[in-house]
Swiss-Prot record:
This is Protein Flattop homolog. It is found in: Cytoplasm, Cytoskeleton, Flagellum axoneme. CDD domains: Flattop. The gene is CFAP126. GO terms for cellular component: cytoplasm; cytoskeleton; motile cilium. Belongs to the Flattop family.
Length: 137
């Protein structure tokens, strides 16, 4: 047995709620537009002016547009945010072995595609088991 759902039962979640930013406001631009939902922003002033492009079709700055001296991509040595902050990762422990390679599969089962001479896994030698302790480096 099949069920049929009316269109509004499925698609009402996908209907646009506030996508009316392309409409021309009905009031004069000198007046404030009050929000309908009473948000924390109170009344909103309409924006004036227009978007001006600062780059050409190739992505280069147009003439007359000033370059920013400092940005996130060309910071200097005097920037305290990057130079004086604490390191993100701790320093490497010199007592730990450097080349830890696992050549065993799931639960220590020997694999045929990795060599056994590079195993540095820590295991416990249990008498009567077929597992081997390869921690001999």
């Amino acid at each position: 047995m099949s069920r049929s759902y009316p269109g509004e039962q499925v698609e009402h979640a996908f209907n646009s709620k506030r996508l009316k930013n392309w409409e021309v406001p009905a009031v004069d631009k000198s007046q404030a537009i009050s929000t309908s939902t009473g948000t924390r922003f109170g009344t909103l002033q309409p924006r004036s002016g227009r978007t001006q492009f600062i780059v050409d079709d190739n992505g280069h700055l147009k003439s007359g547009v000033p370059k920013l001296e400092k940005s996130a991509f060309n910071f200097t040595q005097t920037t305290p945010v990057f130079m004086d902050s604490a390191p993100r990762w701790p320093k490497e422990n010199p007592t730990w072995p450097k080349n830890m390679k696992a050549t065993m599969g799931y639960k220590g089962i020997q694999s045929n595609y990795l060599p056994t001479n590079t195993v540095t896994l820590k295991a416990v030698e249990v008498p009567g088991t077929t597992e081997r302790n390869f921690n001999f480096m």
